Structure formats: C-alpha cells, structure tokens
Amino acid sequence: STLAAVLAGNEKFTVTEGSAEFLGRDLLSMPIEDRARLGLFLGFQYPVEIPGVTMANFMKLAVNEQRKFRGEEPLSAAEFLKLMREKSAVVELSSKLTSRAVNEGFSGGEKKKNEIFQMAMLDPKLAILDETDSGLDIDALRIVATGVTKLHRADNATVVITHYQRLLDYIVPDVVHVLYKGRIIHSGDKSLALRLEKEGYDWLINEYDR
C-alpha cells in the first residue's frame, strides 16, 4: 500500500532516496494529476465517497482531461454515454449507480466494481490495485477479477496488491513478487502464490532475515 501511494503521488510520503520512471519520465517529480493524465491509475483499498458529484460527471471530466493531455478532442455527450455503457458492462455495473454520487451509499462490492469501471473508462497504461479483493464476497470477487482480466492487453500492465491467493483463482498473474521491508525478496509465477497460501510467508522471511 505504501508503494502504491508513493507511485500515485500521495503527499503524506516523502521519498528520501531512489527513483521511479514511468514511460521514460521521472515519475517522482510529477504532480499527482500529471501522473494520472500520463496513464497511472490507483484503485483504492477503501474507495472514498464524493457527495454531490455524479459518477457520470466525474468520469466525463476525467476522461476528457486525459484526452486534452494527449491533444485529442473531448468526447461529445453521445460518445461519452456510449463509452460509459460499454465499460459498465465489463463489470456488470448498474446504470442506476452511474447516475448517483461517486460511491455514495454503494455497498463494498459496488465500490470495488466502480473502481474497475473507472479503470476501464480511463484505460491506463499502468493500474495499481491495492487490496481490491478486500471485503468482497465470492460473486463480487469474480466480477471484479473478470473485469481486470478483460482489460489486460499487451500495451498495458496491472499491479495487483493482495495478501490472499483467492483472487488468483480468477486472475492468472504473469509474475508474483513478494515485497518485504521495502524490497522484493522473491519472485515467481502463480505457483509461488499457491505455495504462500499453503505454507505462509515464514519460510521466506526467515531466509531473508538470516
């Protein structure tokens, strides 16, 4: 979660050493909004509510800001509504929710689906999903995971931060990394996640701390 927050530009954190590049740019020197415009997306563990701002207005502004950054014309109302219908179908998000204030009164599962809907609308180059599976029942987990899988292409990437293997019942990762004390201490394929689910993390941590 700390890594995700730092990459996204959370001002609570100060980077004292090291660097981070994204698409050939110095990420750490960029303001939050430019990181988003460039194609970095962060899905929150606990999505916030924004009373008074409808999902439709929120997403139209966000999408057109990205288009402006790329030198593209803004979407017309008809084009935007068509895009919103297409992307909401990816995560089975009810059209009733897109007309309501952002996350206001949404269930936990609806908030997480809404995060993936936003990801679909913004089409980021790099999406970081922080504990997206937290608090989801099995049906919501399946829908969210299926949405993430559908959005994966050769020209984008998704980092999924999780402590549980169950999400990987639906998402097959290209690489699994174990982050401990600020460092990647082990990497592997899905079999590593299965082993961690079965044996826990102690064998890795003990080896690292030795």
Label each PLM-derived region with a short phrase.
Residues M119-A120:
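ABC ATPase C-loop
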Residues T16-R25:
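Conserved ABC transporter NBD signature motif
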Residues L38, L42-Y46, G52-K68, F80-L83:
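Q-loop/switch helix immediately C-terminal to the Walker
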Residues V175, L179, R183-N206:
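Conserved beta-strand-loop-alpha-helix hinge in the C-terminal portion
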Residues L141-A154:
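Helical segment within the ABC ATPase nucleotide-binding domain
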Residues I128-T132, D139:
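Walker B catalytic motif
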Residues A8:
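Helix-to-loop junction immediately C-terminal to a conserved catalytic motif
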Residues D155-H163:
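Conserved H-loop
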